[in-house]
């Protein structure tokens, strides 16, 4: 609770575009600013003032011209925004004769005039707003406090407030803007008089700057306060995001840049605001611009934010405990680099905060350095000096430098500290069989489609290939998804022969599918496997995924001991057990395998996946085929799981991995089941 100001300055802004509830949502510039002073102590209203503002783009919508009676000729000689704000400040100071102890505060019809017009536009034009624009009274909220029985805030405007107070409709001033300011002055006088006696004591606040900070994974976050911003420039920082959302209050540490599977920024960020109201205002900035790029803004959840920004490391929390620091990320450090060498690298012109204490090296779980580090600088000047050393040499390696954020520190540390190394399992009794339909071979009997529409389905691909669709192997369509599970625009098709793959590539290369031309290349199953696991395939050849697990493990000859897991089988089934082949990869049934780095792109239902944990083609012969019968079940309940299927076949010998539940294109279970007995 703060003291009530002596004066209120009623403020109203008009842009070259939308009005009312859509004000500011179209990113149009301010063209007219109107204001009037209300003396709360003496209950008097001053004169109406207005100033035209010349926008950079002299283009007005037809609705704006009709509402305001302003055209481009009127604006051509008007002052620009910074000059108009100086006129406003000077006029208010002269009228109030501001001295020691005199206070005033802005009052607007809703949040849009200050948060969605003045602050964003001033930020884009590098105009410094006066102090008075960082606090204001929302007349709608104050009226709701004064008259609880009035309509809801989303339905409350100047006309509704005047109607609730039984004011006569003002037809003397029909010009848009002036009539609203006149009515707002009268509404304020009515609110501070009998019988309401309302006090304006708790204004809205606009944050001066974004505050960085940490977020715990156990923190409770309101899911209605988070948005996802997409299309950011790769070099953007959390300060750039805060500037894009200028006027809206972002929670401390609430700007989290997202990283892709390779640890690089993917152009997305999750932003957490202080309230749902600010989140809703942020959604109105959908497709507003950051420089020359438009930014998409969508709703997100608290869980999404915690996945990116949440962390539990005490080391990170201690590193980020120093507030108001600029973070710089170093990449490509020699693995033997020390803190003293990093301090010497930046030198005296950009001293690191706290010396060696301001450096955080990133390591793998076993303590090996990754070549990444984060460094703290006390001010923007030091950080800019540091960034000028981008690609300077440290030892014999050039070092990449980027502005970073607290959330990026959490993500990088979480990624490297939580990725488990591949465990060396003990010799098991159950073999993991490779997929028989995707042998890693150099026979070029596959085709790759690149540039597919993101909405393309398997049926669209079959239609695109026309006569060659009959030459596709069973389950031979593999759609490549990105790390977020969305289509990447690539697909691999397994053909029945190399000739058909060659002819399909020749005939359909650069043919169109849904107004997009599609590139078609002939390739091998091995190349397909590399891409499905996160590698890249281009004109320069294959670039393997970040970490491939070894193709096989070799175990020593097992002793003649029956494992404890075999106790579930009948004794007759354990006679003459088959000897294990030491050259083949075997894993226990419950063993969980990990890649050192998550870069696997899953295929949709119906397109089987191929991982590098299995033996190569040369090792396939070492696993003798196991006889069995496939049983198809129909009429299953939609929520039936593998456990229920195995219970149904209790008493028969089968492996748990022999159950295959079918799913449709929307990844929902369909009532079919295949079991190998």
Curated annotation (Swiss-Prot):
InterPro entries linked to this entry: ESRP, Nucleotide-bd_a/b_plait_sf, RBD_domain_sf, RNaseH-like_sf, RNaseH_sf, RRM_dom
CDD domains: RRM2_ESRP1, RRM3_ESRP1_ESRP2
Modification Phosphoserine, positions: 543
Main location as per UniProt: nucleus
Gene Ontology molecular-function annotations: mRNA binding
Location relative to the cell: Nucleus
Residue ranges annotated for the RRM domain, each copy included: 225-302, 326-406, 445-525
Keyword RNA-binding: yes
Keyword annotations: Methylation, mRNA processing, mRNA splicing, Nucleus, Phosphoprotein, Repeat, RNA-binding
Superkingdom of origin: Eukaryota
Modified residues (Omega-N-methylarginine): 578
An individual GO BP term: epithelial cell proliferation
Cellular component terms (Gene Ontology): nucleoplasm; nucleus; ribonucleoprotein complex
Task performed by this protein: mRNA splicing factor that regulates the formation of epithelial cell-specific isoforms. Specifically regulates the expression of FGFR2-IIIb, an epithelial cell-specific isoform of FGFR2. Also regulates the splicing of CD44, CTNND1, ENAH, 3 transcripts that undergo changes in splicing during the epithelial-to-mesenchymal transition (EMT). Acts by directly binding specific sequences in mRNAs. Binds the GU-rich sequence motifs in the ISE/ISS-3, a cis-element regulatory region present in the mRNA of FGFR2.
Similarity comment text for this entry: Belongs to the ESRP family.
Protein's name according to its UniProt entry: Epithelial splicing regulatory protein 1
């Amino acid at each position: 609770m703060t003291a009530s100001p002596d004066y209120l300055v009623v403020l109203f802004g008009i842009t070259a575009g939308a009005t009312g509830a859509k004000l500011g949502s179209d990113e149009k510039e301010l063209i007219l600013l109107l204001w009037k002073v209300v003396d709360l102590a003496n209950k008097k209203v001053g004169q109406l003032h207005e100033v035209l503002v010349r926008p950079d783009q002299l283009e007005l919508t037809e609705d704006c011209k009709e509402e305001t009676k302003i055209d481009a000729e009127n604006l051509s000689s008007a002052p620009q925004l910074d000059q108009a704000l100086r006129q406003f400040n000077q006029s208010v100071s002269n009228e109030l004769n501001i001295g020691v102890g005199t206070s005033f505060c802005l009052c607007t019809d809703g949040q849009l005039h200050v948060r969605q017009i003045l602050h964003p536009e001033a930020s884009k034009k590098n105009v410094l707003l006066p102090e008075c624009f960082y606090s204001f009274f929302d007349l709608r909220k104050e009226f709701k406090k004064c008259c609880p029985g009035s309509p809801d805030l989303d339905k409350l405007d100047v006309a509704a407030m005047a109607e609730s107070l039984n004011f006569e409709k003002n037809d003397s001033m029909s010009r848009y803007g002036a009539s609203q300011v006149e009515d707002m002055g009268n509404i304020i006088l009515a609110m501070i008089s009998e019988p309401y006696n309302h006090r304006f004591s708790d204004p809205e606040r606009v944050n001066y700057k974004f505050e960085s900070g940490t977020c715990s994974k156990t923190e409770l976050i309101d899911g209605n306060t988070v948005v996802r911003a997409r299309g950011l420039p790769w070099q953007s920082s959390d300060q750039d995001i805060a500037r894009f959302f200028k006027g809206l209050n972002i929670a401390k540490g609430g700007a989290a840049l997202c990283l892709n599977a390779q640890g690089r920024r993917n152009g997305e960020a999750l932003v957490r605001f202080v309230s749902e109201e600010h989140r809703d205002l942020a959604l109105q900035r959908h497709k507003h611009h950051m420089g020359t790029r438009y930014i998409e803004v969508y709703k997100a959840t608290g869980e999404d934010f915690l996945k990116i920004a949440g962390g539990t490391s005490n080391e990170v929390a201690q590193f980020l405990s120093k507030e108001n620091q600029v973070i710089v990320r170093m990449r490509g450090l020699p693995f033997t680099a020390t803190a003293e060498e990093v301090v010497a690298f930046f030198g005296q012109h950009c001293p690191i905060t706290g010396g060696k204490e301001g450096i955080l090296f990133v390591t793998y779980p076993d303590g090996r350095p990754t070549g990444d580090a984060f460094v703290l600088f006390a001010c923007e000047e030091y950080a800019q000096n540091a960034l000028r050393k981008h690609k300077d040499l440290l030892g014999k390696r050039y070092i990449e430098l980027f502005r970073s954020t607290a959330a990026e520190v959490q993500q990088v540390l979480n990624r490297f500290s939580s990725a488990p190394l591949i465990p060396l399992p003990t010799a098991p009794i159950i073999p993991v069989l490779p997929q028989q339909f995707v042998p890693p071979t150099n026979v070029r009997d596959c085709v790759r489609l690149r540039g597919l529409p993101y909405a393309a389905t398997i049926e669209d691909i079959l239609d695109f290939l026309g006569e060659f669709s009959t030459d596709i192997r069973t389950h031979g369509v593999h759609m490549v998804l990105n790390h977020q599970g969305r289509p990447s625009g690539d697909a691999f098709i397994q053909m029945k022969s190399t000739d058909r793959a060659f002819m399909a590539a020749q005939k359909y290369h650069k043919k169109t599918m849904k107004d997009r031309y599609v590139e078609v290349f002939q390739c091998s199953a091995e190349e397909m496997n590399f891409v499905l696991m996160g590698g890249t395939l281009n004109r320069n050849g294959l670039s393997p995924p970040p970490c491939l697990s070894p193709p096989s493990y070799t175990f020593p000859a097992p002793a003649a001991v029956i494992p404890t897991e075999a106790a579930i089988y009948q004794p007759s089934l354990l006679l003459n057990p088959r000897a294990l082949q030491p050259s083949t990869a075997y894993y226990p049934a419950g063993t969980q395998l990990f890649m050192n780095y998550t870069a696997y792109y899953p295929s949709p239902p119906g397109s089987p996946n191929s991982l590098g944990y299995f033996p190569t083609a040369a090792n396939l012969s070492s696993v003798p085929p196991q006889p069995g019968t496939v049983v198809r079940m129909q009429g299953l309940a939609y929520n039936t799981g593998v456990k229920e299927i195995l219970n149904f076949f209790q008493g028969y010998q089968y492996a748990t991995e022999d159950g295959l539940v079918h799913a449709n294109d929307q990844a929902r279970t369909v009532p079919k089941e295949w079991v190998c007995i």
